[in-house]
UniProtKB/Swiss-Prot annotation:
One GO CC term, this protein: ribonucleoprotein complex
Keywords (A to Z) from UniProt: Ribonucleoprotein, Ribosomal protein
Annotated protein name in UniProt: Large ribosomal subunit protein bL36B
Signal peptide segment: none
GO molecular function: structural constituent of ribosome
Lineage: Bacteria, Bacillati, Cyanobacteriota, Cyanophyceae, Synechococcales
One GO-annotated biological process of the protein: translation
Amino acid sequence: MKVRASVKKMCDKCRVIRRHGRVMVICTASPRHKQRQG
């Protein structure tokens, strides 16, 4: 899980979602693309 100031989709399988008021990126194709804003 990368913690970044700005989260972006890294591939076309990435999805931007909100959990508990935080913006996150989850990816089914490659879990290395997981990010959280903070």
